[in-house]
């Protein structure tokens, strides 16, 4: 639609960006993108994918590898409130421990977004839900251990992200 109706443009504003798929399509074409979403977790994800701040990608890979080996030793907020509901107890315990560890790394804002995005997407893979977080299954049948993956590092220039 855009290619058929707009001649030459350099900037695209996606003000209700949601998953970011449309904005990413234009980012891949070398356009400057402006994104907005009121949901804070989306802001974190967009900072990962569309942010301009330089990151040390090797450091991110190393930290995520370390986070995957986290062996929680005590209960935490996530295990107490979400264990055996939205997540298996062990996954909830590990999620909470990882989330706490992320706060202690010496990283810039975008690097922290990479770590949080990795955790958010890993949580989604092991969640005991049926489409959204208001509807979880009473029987815990999602027992796969949580595993964080390293988000792709996109080269971005002059993008703007709002919440």
Q: What is each PLM-predicted segment?
A:
Residues 32, 38-162:
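Class I S-adenosyl-L-methionine-dependent methyltransferase module
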Residues 1-8:
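Conserved alpha-helix/loop element of class I SAM-dependent methyltransferases that forms part
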Residues 22-23:
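Conserved SAM-dependent methyltransferase scaffold
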Residues 8-18:
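Conserved class I S-adenosyl-L-methionine
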Residues 26:
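Aromatic pocket-lining residues of Rossmann-like dinucleotide-binding sites
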């Amino acid at each position: 639609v855009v290619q058929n109706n707009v001649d030459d443009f350099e900037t695209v504003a996606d003000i209700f960006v949601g998953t970011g798929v449309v904005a990413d399509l234009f980012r891949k074409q070398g356009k400057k993108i402006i994104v907005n979403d009121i949901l804070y977790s989306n802001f974190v994800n967009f900072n990962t994918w569309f942010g301009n701040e330089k990151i040390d990608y090797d450091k991110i890979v190393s930290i995520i590898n370390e986070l995957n080996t986290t062996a929680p030793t005590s209960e935490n907020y996530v295990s107490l409130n979400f264990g055996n509901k939205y997540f298996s107890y062990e996954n909830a315990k590990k999620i909470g421990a990882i989330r706490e560890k992320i706060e202690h790394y010496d990283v810039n804002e975008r690097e922290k977004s990479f770590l949080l995005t990795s955790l958010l997407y890993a949580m989604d893979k092991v969640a005991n839900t049926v489409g959204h977080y208001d509807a979880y299954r009473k029987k815990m049948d999602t027992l796969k251990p949580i595993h964080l993956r390293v988000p792709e590092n996109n080269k971005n220039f002059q993008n703007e992200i709002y919440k």
